[in-house]
Amino acid sequence: MATAEVLNIGKKLYEGKTKEVYELLDSPGKVLLQSKDQITAGNAARKNHLEGKAAISNKITSCIFQLLQEAGIKTAFTRKCGETAFIAPQCEMIPIEWVCRRIATGSFLKRNPGVKEGYKFYPPKVELFFKDDANNDPQWSEEQLIAAKFCFAGLLIGQTEVDIMSHATQAIFEILEKSWLPQNCTLVDMKIEFGVDVTTKEIVLADVIDNDSWRLWPSGDRSQQKDKQSYRDLKEVTPEGLQMVKKNFEWVAERVELLLKSESQCRVVVLMGSTSDLGHCEKIKKACGNFGIPCELRVTSAHKGPDETLRIKAEYEGDGIPTVFVAVAGRSNGLGPVMSGNTAYPVISCPPLTPDWGVQDVWSSLRLPSGLGCSTVLSPEGSAQFAAQIFGLSNHLVWSKLRASILNTWISLKQADKKIRECNL
């Protein structure tokens, strides 16, 4: 029988409308976020006790943060702790709500007369609002945020930091939007917050993402909304109305775990012409692992054993798992073209070129007979990424890792540029 975890909880650091934050005396730099059985709307102008909401909110946040972390998004989340709390790195919160919208609805329509409900934003529209309950969280411009000269955990919030949060908001929305699609749910909009990790001094996604944080429409139908808007829309709060709201929240909590899995399988099979190319192939396998894609290595030569090459091909075609073949053959590459001419599956040639004959050898991968769709990628890591992009069309987990990688590359360049500029001062 499992025993309940005992934490050495210190003082209360913060209390909001729906959660409390406590220090953890035995874990410096970590805090406990405890959810409440409370639901609010209109900056708590409407407020009700909702039994079980804390557990529902905690489950949703824990699953969403796990999904984002596994994708590669920097997130203030360590692990779930019991039914109603989770442990996270301690952050100094930036008092801005970042809103990302795919579909125009709600307050956006009030602030932008003439825009019809249902208008779609490409790319998603990012807005920011200063957290100030007394003034109903006024909308801010990026310039206002920069002019405020906020400093949290020693980090001054300037143009670079604002750009990072803006780009991260869009990436996070797109990952969650893509993740809800297999459940036939449209993510209409969402709001998130960032903080500065007091230990690493990095900007990270923080606070919570639960059913209070977004609009979620099954089948893209507003009348089926399952988010907190169903509570806001109540003309009068009754026990029956609250029960309906709770059922909506439970519906989301039941499905959010499904976002951590994908019904679409995927696999990369690397065919090498010789074990002398094993090092090259292992780089491909390692890169596939970074995208969560299973990868198998096989040895076969299309020149010396074409019958065995085609038998291996048939083996993988026969089990029904979506597969991308990567052909690794030096000198004259017959492996990629032979595979491409005999399978409807994608084939990528990734020849291990050598300094002496590489310039000549590469033409066996580039100049092919008509009717072959074999692509050529020279980088082992690049061939794995290309395979991931193929699978990402139908697998939201792979796509999420690709999207987070794009964001993280952009952030690293932005931070490198900031560092260089500071050195020039």
UniProtKB/Swiss-Prot annotation:
Modified-residue entries (Phosphoserine), positions: 27, 107, 274
Family: In the N-terminal section; belongs to the SAICAR synthetase family. In the C-terminal section; belongs to the AIR carboxylase family. Class II subfamily.
EC number of this enzyme: 4.1.1.21, 6.3.2.6
Gene name linked to the record: PAICS
Oligomeric and partner information: Homooctamer.
Origin organism lineage: Eukaryota, Metazoa, Chordata, Craniata, Vertebrata
Lineage top rank: taxon: Eukaryota
Keyword rRNA processing: no
Modified-residue entries (Phosphothreonine), positions: 238
Residues with PTM N-acetylalanine: 2
Family matches, as CDD domains: SAICAR_synt_Ade5
Modified residues (N6-acetyllysine): 36, 247
Outcome reported for the amino acid change (mutating residue 53 to R): In PAICSD; uncertain significance; no effect on protein abundance; decreased phosphoribosylaminoimidazole carboxylase activity; decreased phosphoribosylaminoimidazolesuccinocarboxamide synthase activity
Chain's role: Bifunctional phosphoribosylaminoimidazole carboxylase and phosphoribosylaminoimidazole succinocarboxamide synthetase catalyzing two reactions of the de novo purine biosynthetic pathway.
Name recorded for this polypeptide: Bifunctional phosphoribosylaminoimidazole carboxylase/phosphoribosylaminoimidazole succinocarboxamide synthetase
